[in-house]
Amino acid sequence: MTSNLAGNTNTAQDSDRPMIQMLSPEGKRVRSGEYDSYAADLTGEDMMEFYRDMVLIRRVDAEGNALQRQGQLGLWAPLKGQEAAQIGLGRALREQDFVFPTYREHGLAWCRGVEPETLLGMFRGQHHGGWDPQENRFHTYTIVIGSQVLHATGYAMGVKFDGDVATGDLDRDTISVACMGDGATSQGDVSEGLNFAAVFHAPVLFFIQNNQFAISEPNSAQMAAPLFKRGTGFGVPGVRVDGNDVLAMYSVAKASADSIRAGLGPMLIEAFTYRMGAHTTADDPTKYRSDALTESWLEKDPIDRVRRFLHHEDYADQKFFDEIDEEADALAARIRAACMAMEPPAPSEMFDSVFVEKHPLIEAEQREYLEYLDSFAEEGAL
């Protein structure tokens, strides 16, 4: 059977439940029943902001990719194609919510106030994170596949124990978000997180960006059932959303977050999307997927979809689009200059953030390491 989005045979995505879509690839509004009310208050200006977010973060992504190819970054994990999934979710969250990302959540980082330059610094090796997770309510990037799901679940359990959910106070009730890709769902950590979340009724949203490939493995080689059903056996209800539709992502994420915030337990969203670029800059996607498949997804580009909608509804004129392009150019120049100006960190800094408080053993190791470095200077002086 052929998926209505992927354009390729993929039995893992066959389902008797339709995918939630609110904007067609042509930019036309699609009614979605239960989720329409969550989009009712959105204005043309809101849709223009969605467009701006996606254009700017795509430009950040392009610069990150280019900087790595030029030897300025050690690695980069491209986001292109997944902007709607991340921006839609990011703009649906509240300030107190806590996001636990993987290494590709540049759009969510943007929504949580993490500066693009800071992301570049991490991939440049200038620091190990560079932002305060508590300030941004956004954990540092997680490289170990699936481990962040346990962190998000544990955090949500703590939120419940502290009484910060189901109080009726929208500025207090808190959820956590466990981000992952389709490949991560094969990790045992994800199953453990789902089980603990369900058993302890933890306020956590499991957010799966199904971009069709776990590095080089297609969905058909990973799973025999659609991912939105993955939580069912654990007691975690799920929904599948057109991940290239920012309006659907926003509405479903807001509905799910409201339900979790009200104390109704964890939920799961599968954002059905496509990674247009490589898994990372260490990868060559032409080795495992066809150009025809990628071309079919270009027709569903998340940014073009919103642009068509804004045109169709007369919300934006050419001047608006030109101004966004100019802003993207300025952003690209800014972050490129910032990246090129970054100085290597002092070697001793790796000891500074091991523990919250100073620890005598760490301090001793730092002293020994500094003495070791000084010995080279002494030898050079001789």
Task: List each language-model region with its residue ranges.
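Conserved acidic/glycine
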Residues: 1-84, 277, 286, 291-382
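A general structural signal for short secondary-structure junctions and capping/turn motifs
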Residues: 11-13, 89-92, 258-260
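Residue-level signal for pocket-adjacent positions within structured domains
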Residues: 17-18, 37, 62, 70-71, ...
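Residues that form or immediately flank small-molecule/cofactor binding pockets and catalytic motifs
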Residues: 27, 104, 243
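Cofactor-binding active-site loop characterized by glycine-rich and histidine/acidic residues
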Residues: 59-62, 66-202, 218-228, 233-235
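A general secondary-structure junction signal
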Residues: 103, 271-273, 354
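Glycine-rich ThDP/TPP pyrophosphate-binding loop and its adjacent helix/strand module
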Residues: 146-344
